[in-house]
């Protein structure tokens, strides 16, 4: 919108008749072409028929007057309204023919007639959109043709006016757009913007003005005058009180529906300890506040009736005097003053209560009591205790009874799932290692890392308790992925943690401090590759300073080291794993990476170590130059090697070559070989209760082997969920349960069913199986 000044002037409209023709130059046609239009008066409002031929105009001109309705104002200016609809000249047909016959069906309105009738071609026709509308020949032809129109034709045209006027308007065609050229696109288009006047949509006058405004003084004067007027109104004869009658609207009764009012009885229970604590508080207050004036003149001033009494032992507690009683004895003038005081009620600080250690301990104890009730059937099955039936849980009992009946009828070994250790912190993490506390068998430490350690920058250690399977008691965040764990036997609160970056740290599980007691970061001879296993060993040889429990580790840097920590950790190499295979000597390093090790159960100097080249070496801590024995059967890295707890000459090994080997230390070749599929075996472990039973985990399944039953197939196989791989296995030291950690961060507890140890000595049973196997080989 542009800022324009509009002059409102009352115009006088006049209607004048004129037969003048109006020459209009249309922009649709070529330059130097004009159109001659004759505007006829619209006095009858009738409709006339029209075909596509231009000669229809000649017939109509003879019947209608040749006068044009013109509107002029008082100044003589032409203000005649233009027609609302201007048809496109391209719509008209170029064919010449007879028009206005009796069978014409195409109609048009009178308002459209001037525009259509006078768009006739002149004597010269050069092509589409090149007609000339000038000349008198066109006007004379219109006059001669229009006179031949009969009255019947006019009546027919009037009757069809209404139905065809709308269709004629809808026949408007969009004007052709001008074709864009490069010179037009490159030209500069000027756009002019102008500011419009302010449009007020809402204007609320203010009831206050600024002190700095010009009207501030006037407003103050009016306010002061009004204040004085209000003061002088009382008692002034100029003001008379009058009573006015007002109309009270008729009241209407309405009903409202609401909820029914229910009465509830409430009761408060007063327990024995509440009464005991209340009675003790009253007794303490009475004993401390009833004092004698002779014995406590220094502590009770004379003005105590108006002030407060403060007990020496409770100087931080404000007391108020509620009564003072004076008694006079008849036989003496001894006056005793007794004052009864009560402590003032002070609101406790809720924030301090919530942050107190006492509240945390109480909540932890309460949580364990509640979870003991919830997990009672599962914990009882784990500890091999009788299950207490819950009368309110009939459905669960029926399901357990049906499951028990099926298991009794089948007599087949199977794994019964009890529960799993998992929380939000462990979801999506890989369980890399697990270990029991040597003094507290209910405490389990689990190490977490990333799958295949693609992201070694996030490690986690959780200490789980059987008393709370839903949340760990201790959580330690590590800078790198956790690869190895072990509890100390002499100091059960110390947990050694090996990490993927080669760091070894020792944490105190008695506290929740995230800072370790000590670590190997300051040691000059620390590991430079992942630490795959840690073990605390009682070392009795050497000097007095070297005796005691030491920590032994194996790493991918090819070293087996022992760690002694007093103020800091010191490292000494027990063995450097030299490359034994000629194929591995092509590598730059002369040491082969160590993957696992295990010390002999009866001789702490002897230990086995598994390497990445697939060999198992028997070593001694007293001699670090050469291997005592080497066992070569695996073709890929050895992930686990473990001595039998019942037979000290037998050990197991597993590898990524899909096999499990049973060895006897006096033989260079394995006694037995086990495989159940083309899958990598991640972990193995002997059962602590049966000499012939061991467990193994591979990709997608858990296997339990019993050598008494079969040495070809596992006794039972438990398949995991699709996409979940078990990564670690651990037997319970006191019950027939096995724990399985997987790649999703869950540690599932299973109970072994229908697997019992045979009669006689466990070691002899395993020896008999080995001897029978060796006899069959010869």
Swiss-Prot record:
Ribosomal protein among keywords: no
Deletion consequences: Morpholino knockdown results in ciliopathy-related phenotypes, such as curved bodies, hydrocephalus, abnormal otolith, randomized left-right asymmetry, and pronephric cysts, accompanied with paralyzed pronephric cilia.
Compartments where located: Cytoplasm, Cytoskeleton, Flagellum axoneme; Cytoplasm, Cytoskeleton, Cilium axoneme; Dynein axonemal particle
Record-level GO BP terms: axonemal dynein complex assembly; cilium movement
Main location: cytoplasm
Organism placement in taxonomy: Eukaryota, Metazoa, Chordata, Craniata, Vertebrata
GO MF, any single term: dynein heavy chain binding
Pfam families: WD40 (PF00400)
Quaternary structure and interacting proteins, as annotated: Part of the multisubunit axonemal dynein complex formed at least of two heavy chains and a number of intermediate and light chains.
Residue ranges of WD repeats: 477-517, 526-573, 586-629, 633-673, 676-715, 721-760
Keywords, sorted A to Z: Cell projection, Cilium, Cytoplasm, Cytoskeleton, Flagellum, Repeat, WD repeat
Single GO cellular component term: dynein axonemal particle
InterPro entries, per the entry: Dynein_IC, WD40/YVTN_repeat-like_dom_sf, WD40_repeat_dom_sf, WD40_rpt
The organism's place on the tree of life at top rank: Eukaryota
SUPFAM superfamilies: WD40 repeat-like
Function: Plays a critical role in the assembly of axonemal dynein complex. Plays a key role in ciliary motility.
Species in which this protein is naturally found: Danio rerio
Record protein name field: Dynein axonemal intermediate chain 4
